[in-house]
């Protein structure tokens, strides 16, 4: 969801310097990394480490603004202004997200982002808690399949090149456990 927006704003190559596209073959929340595996190309946006890094790249002066932009994009893609955060899920993520917190501190310790970890995680946990229905997902998928254009109106959200790249990442990296 946010990947297309980040590509649109920064370009594919700029994003690829910070977030990779390699399938990990590991669980989505894996922390078992070594110093030589702590490089951006190993953190695709379909696993927690890559998604956390993606949150640092969203546009906005604050993380609340960054999240608001992401949520608005999802609402537009899904043609559903009612999409919102499931607050119970968000609170649970924030209160029990110890592995994600450890992972974020590890990423920061290795210089992969400079922002305050808790600000980044607030955005990440909120993004993980967005409640959508199957229709919403279908509309978002249609925008990607329709080369970055909205399903009903053909309004362009991002260039076809970015939609192709997001689709490729979904196909290659979306099956993270094998």
Stretches with model-predicted labels:
Residues 1, 46-53, 133-137, 162, ...:
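Catalytic-loop motifs flanking and including active-site residues across diverse enzymes
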Residues 2-7:
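Short, small-residue-biased leader/transition segments that mark boundaries at the very start
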Residues 8-127:
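Active-site-adjacent helix/loop patches that line small-molecule binding or acyl-intermediate pockets
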Residues 56, 105, 139-142, 168-171:
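Generic alpha-helical structural context detector
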Residues 129-132, 158:
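Short, conserved, surface-exposed binding loops centered on an aromatic residue
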Residues 131-150:
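Active-site-proximal alpha-helical segments within enzyme catalytic domains
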Residues 151-178:
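Conserved SxxK-family serine transpeptidase/carboxypeptidase catalytic domain
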């Amino acid at each position: 969801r946010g990947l297309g927006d980040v590509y649109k704003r920064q370009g594919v190559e700029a994003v690829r310097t910070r977030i990779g596209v390699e399938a990990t073959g590991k669980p989505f929340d894996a922390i078992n990394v070594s110093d030589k595996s702590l490089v951006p190309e190993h953190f695709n946006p379909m696993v927690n480490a890559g998604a956390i890094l993606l949150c640092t790249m969203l546009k906005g002066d604050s993380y609340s603004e960054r999240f608001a932009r992401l949520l608005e994009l999802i609402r537009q893609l899904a043609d559903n202004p009612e999409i919102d955060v499931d607050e119970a899920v968000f609170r649970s993520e924030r209160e029990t997200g110890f592995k994600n917190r450890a992972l974020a501190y590890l990423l920061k310790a290795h210089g992969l982002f400079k922002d305050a970890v808790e600000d980044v995680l607030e955005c990440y946990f909120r993004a993980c808690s967005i409640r959508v229905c199957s229709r919403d997902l279908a509309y978002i998928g249609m925008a990607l399949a329709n080369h970055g254009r909205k399903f009903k109106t053909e309004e362009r959200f991002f260039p076809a090149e970015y939609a192709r790249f997001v689709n490729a990442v979904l196909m290659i990296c979306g099956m993270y456990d094998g």
